């Protein structure tokens, strides 16, 4: 149900990333089928579509074209949210892990999905301005979209999710 954000709590090694990847269409289930009737995001932090040899600018424009969006809009949105300044025009492979997290989350938020997939919570960053912007945008999106967060930390799920499920021994 759109707008009803779900948290999936599970210990390490229980299959959290696998279930998120299956929801995104990056992995196939061993049995059964997954049917998508909504626009489902790539998982937050998934850098599979990002080419490390290219700048954030080039990656934004490429991803925008893949999704049929205005490249100028996606680029300016990501520049504003992630605040990488001159680094935005440098190869992503030169970024620190925090910079990659900010870019990845900005890219995810630049595209309107019905369902946003987040593996292990929000990106850890000490940039207060980024945290404020990204948090506000995510809260706004929660009004019309669902966020599915998988984590081993209950407090992460409590902050963003209205309901939760437990993944244990392969059973949800």
Name the predicted role of every residue range.
Residues 2-65:
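ABC ATPase nucleotide-binding domain signature region
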Residues 39, 44-128, 136:
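ABC-family P-loop ATPase nucleotide-binding domains
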Residues 45, 145-159:
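Conserved H-loop
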Residues 113, 145, 161-162:
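Short, well-ordered alpha-helix to beta-strand connector turns
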Residues 131-143:
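Helical segment within the ABC ATPase nucleotide-binding domain
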Residues 160-172:
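H-loop (His-switch) and adjacent beta-strand-loop-beta switch element
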């Amino acid at each position: 149900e759109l707008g009803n954000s779900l948290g999936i709590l599970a210990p390490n090694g229980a299959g959290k990333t696998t279930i998120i990847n299956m929801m995104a269409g990056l992995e196939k289930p061993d049995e059964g089928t997954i049917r998508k009737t909504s626009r489902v995001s790539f998982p937050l932090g998934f850098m599979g579509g990002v080419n490390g040899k290219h700048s954030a600018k080039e990656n934004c424009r490429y991803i925008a074209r893949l999704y049929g969006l205005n490249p100028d809009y996606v680029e300016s949105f990501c520049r504003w949210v992630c605040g990488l300044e001159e680094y935005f025009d440098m190869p992503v492979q030169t970024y620190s892990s925090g910079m990659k997290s900010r870019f990845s989350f900005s890219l995810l938020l630049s595209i309107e999905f019905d369902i946003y997939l987040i593996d292990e919570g929000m990106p850890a960053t000490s940039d207060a301005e980024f945290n404020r912007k990204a948090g506000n945008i995510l809260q706004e999106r929660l009004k019309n979209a669902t966020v599915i967060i998988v984590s081993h930390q209950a407090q992460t799920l409590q902050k963003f999710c209205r309901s939760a499920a437990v993944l244990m021994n392969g059973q949800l």
